[in-house]
UniProtKB/Swiss-Prot annotation:
<dbReference type="GO" id="GO:0005198">
    <property type="term" value="F:structural molecule activity"/>
</dbReference>
<keyword id="KW-0304">Gas vesicle</keyword>
<comment type="similarity">
    <text>Belongs to the gas vesicle GvpA family.</text>
</comment>
<dbReference type="InterPro" id="IPR050530">
    <property type="entry name" value="GvpA"/>
</dbReference>
<dbReference type="GO" id="GO:0033172">
    <property type="term" value="C:gas vesicle shell"/>
</dbReference>
<dbReference type="InterPro" id="IPR047870">
    <property type="entry name" value="Gas_vesicle_GvpA"/>
</dbReference>
<dbReference type="InterPro" id="IPR018493">
    <property type="entry name" value="GvpA-like_CS"/>
</dbReference>
<dbReference type="Pfam" id="PF00741">
    <property type="entry name" value="Gas_vesicle"/>
</dbReference>
<comment type="subunit">
    <text>The gas vesicle shell is 2 nm thick and consists of a single layer of this protein. It forms helical ribs nearly perpendicular to the long axis of the vesicle.</text>
</comment>
<comment type="function">
    <text>Gas vesicles are hollow, gas filled proteinaceous nanostructures found in some microorganisms. During planktonic growth they allow positioning of the organism at a favorable depth for light or nutrient acquisition. GvpA forms the protein shell.</text>
</comment>
<dbReference type="InterPro" id="IPR000638">
    <property type="entry name" value="Gas-vesicle_GvpA-like"/>
</dbReference>
<protein>
    <recommendedName>
        <fullName>Gas vesicle protein A</fullName>
    </recommendedName>
</protein>
<dbReference type="GO" id="GO:0012506">
    <property type="term" value="C:vesicle membrane"/>
</dbReference>
Length: 72
């Protein structure tokens, strides 16, 4: 995947449109510990994309066939 670089500024609408078109995956992990004792651990995976983009990539990796087989 090539990264496109432009010098022009983008409006918020253009940025949101691009995120929904391409999709964004955010993987975050945090741990809070005190004196070597883990107090809190947070793991999050967030995917932001349009339904059309999700279905296109889900079909490419075979996720849609599993869902169809479950409902049949």
């Amino acid at each position: 995947m090539a990264v496109e670089k432009t010098n022009a500024s983008s409006s918020l609408v253009e940025v949101i449109d691009r995120i929904l078109d391409k999709g964004v995956c955010i993987d975050a992990w945090a741990r809070v510990s005190l004196v070597g004792i883990e107090l809190l651990a947070i793991e999050a995976r967030v995917v932001v994309a349009s339904v059309d983009t999700f279905l296109k990539y889900a079909e490419a990796v075979g996720l849609t066939t599993t869902a169809t087989a479950m409902h049949a």
